[in-house]
Amino acid sequence: MAIEDISENARFVLEKRYLAKDEEGNLIETVDGMFRRVADTMAAVDSKYDSTADTKALSDIFYELMTDLKFLPNSPTLMNAGRTLGQLSACFVLPVEDSMEGIFDSVKNAALKIGRAHV
């Protein structure tokens, strides 16, 4: 199975939820472009830890895995990699201190994280 084999319903969901749009809501990204954006963003991280990393080769590997539908990252990664928000996690673990103040600080922090995730 490959990118050209995805169903009409899958394309509909990608267009509604995942692909980049301009300020008027017009699509400005293709499915292929989304996979390239995600692959480039994921590969670029390696250069932070290894100055000799071949990020182009890594990006091509990620891209091929995604376009062959052998591996797809989680929704936040597909939606946000390479974009301003950059939120790639689908869940958070927040510490909660054993006090009323600590509990409400945790609630506040959770609300702030959730708010950023839906921007």
Where are the regions that the model predicts?
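Extended catalytic cores of very large enzyme megasubunits
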Residues: 1-118
